[in-house]
A protein has these predicted regions:
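Mature, structured domains of secreted/extracytosolic soluble proteins
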Residues: 1-185
Length: 185
């Protein structure tokens, strides 16, 4: 997805997602959807595109399910009209916050936060973050995209014991695994 989003962009410039994600300067938070979450969304998107091209619905659904399940889905030329660099980059940057957001700093009431998409669309409402504490520990957390009908669960690792976290630390930020692809529109 990153390579498709960076099509036509030099990887050594700040406009490149490769640069943002590998540079030690910016602190970021990544909401990383599971493979299943991406497959479900892509299957729907590809099915709709194939039906629009005249492919019968059952055939379109079968082809879409196959294409969405391959690791090469973002580099399949037949899908370039559906998965344009602009669309893919919009989805990827919508999953990135421009600061580190650890679970223990999440609000207990749904609160909107800007994503890196806001650098291109300043008026976009961003994502909504929320968590539930049981004593001093986070027991549940969600992130919701503006076009998602329901909030995505942040998958909390049950270890380290006795209370887990989803905070996966990296040199330039933190990653939280989520169960849906966040949809900006």
């Amino acid at each position: 997805a990153i390579n498709r989003a960076d099509s036509g962009v030099a990887p050594t410039t700040s406009a490149s997602l490769v640069w943002v994600l590998s540079n030690f300067g910016p602190n970021i938070t990544v909401f990383a959807p599971t493979n299943l979450a991406f497959q479900q969304l892509l299957t729907v998107q590809i099915t709709q595109a194939l039906i629009a091209q005249g492919v019968p619905p059952l055939t379109a659904a079968a082809q879409a399910a196959f294409l969405a399940s391959t690791p090469a889905v973002f580099s399949t030329p037949a899908l370039y009209p559906v998965l344009t660099p602009t669309v893919v980059k919009g989805i990827v940057v919508y999953h990135l916050l421009g600061s580190r957001a650890f679970l223990n700093n999440f609000p207990t009431a749904a609160t909107s936060y800007p994503t890196l998409l806001n650098s291109a669309v300043p008026t976009h409402p961003g994502v909504s973050l929320n968590c539930t504490f049981t004593g001093p520990f986070v027991s549940a957390a969600t992130v919701k995209g503006i076009a998602n009908p329901t909030a995505s669960n942040i998958l909390i690792n049950p270890t380290p014991e006795p209370n887990g976290t989803s905070d996966q630390f990296f040199v330039n930020g933190v990653i939280h695994k989520i169960d849906q692809v966040l949809r900006p529109q």
